A protein has these predicted regions:
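Asp-box/BNR beta-propeller blade signature and adjacent active/binding-site loops
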Residues: 1-282
Length: 282
């Protein structure tokens, strides 16, 4: 296996690379975004491009100061071909001898395949609640939704936009449980949204339960598939999901912190049951 990115390429020192995100624009090279640094408050964004489907890669390009690129989940491409990336920052605030962690979600927009960038947000103030690692969904009716993990309420939180991501409504909880764990989502070719997440429940389940849900409107969700369900000392986390041109859905995730698992699903074969009151149906 060939190493594609190294933290030392631009920094000149042995430093970690984090959270790689692949994105294929409608036209232009394949893009690989990643973070470089010792930890979240200190890291910066870099990216590379490939014109031969990932066989070879350009030299690393550092994003402008203050820009990190898509923090965990892939960007989306808008109708005007601008690329909109869900991003977020994490840092520690010390006040009255008390240290608290602050998570702020924002968006990063490029109209020229990464040459220049514009920031939208932050979308939360970090005072009432923290949200990070958003997934962007653009529905056929023109509305846009961002779904984020949060420390609070053991729910996935959401915000909505009616103007292609320029402005956003107030945050609210979805009905979907989540144990402060990473998620990912994709719009299917048939116009439905598909979400991969840990559907934790009130019985104390955590990251040992990994699920797939779908929705037509981002409000009412339906259970579609259970990827993992192993009670005990197991962890299945940090999913990534895409749909390929043949219609199949490809999902990768960390399998018990030992390896990466790849699952292929046919969304035409889903047998859907409505998720009511946050309970995964039998």
């Amino acid at each position: 296996m060939e190493k594609v990115a190294s933290g030392s390429e631009l920094s000149g020192r042995n430093v970690a690379c984090w959270n790689p995100v692949l994105f294929q624009p409608k036209s232009g090279p394949l893009m690989l975004f990643y973070k470089v640094g010792d930890d979240e408050p200190e890291w910066w964004g870099e990216y590379k491009t490939s014109s031969d489907e990932g066989k070879t890669w350009s030299k690393a390009i550092r994003l402008p100061d203050g820009f990190l690129g898509p923090i965990k989940n892939k960007p989306i491409q808008l109708s005007d071909d601008c690329i909109l990336s869900p991003s977020s920052i994490e840092y520690y605030k010390i006040q009255n001898n008390d240290t608290s962690e602050v998570w702020l979600t924002h968006l990063e927009l490029t109209s020229d395949l990464g040459k220049t960038w514009k920031k939208i947000g932050p979308l939360n103030d970090g005072k009432d609640f923290n949200v990070i690692q958003g997934s962007l969904l653009s529905y056929p009716n023109g509305k846009m939704q961002i779904l984020c993990r949060t420390e609070y309420a053991r729910r996935i939180y959401q915000s909505w936009s009616n103007d292609q991501g320029k402005t956003w409504n107030s945050w609210s909880p979805t009905e979907l449980p989540n144990p402060d764990s990473g998620t990912d989502a994709v719009m299917l070719a048939d116009g439905r949204a598909l979400l991969v997440y840990n559907h934790s429940t009130s019985d104390g389940r955590d990251r040992d339960y990994l699920n797939v849900a779908v929705s037509k409107d981002g409000k009412k969700w339906y259970a579609a598939y259970v990827l993992e369900n192993q009670k005990g000392d197991f962890e299945f986390s940090y999913p990534a999901v895409i749909q390929t041109s043949d219609g199949f859905v490809h999902i990768t995730y960390t399998w018990n912190r030992e390896r990466i698992k790849h699952v292929v699903l046919d969304p035409k074969k889903f047998v859907l049951k409505e998720i009511q009151n946050g309970v995964w149906p039998e």
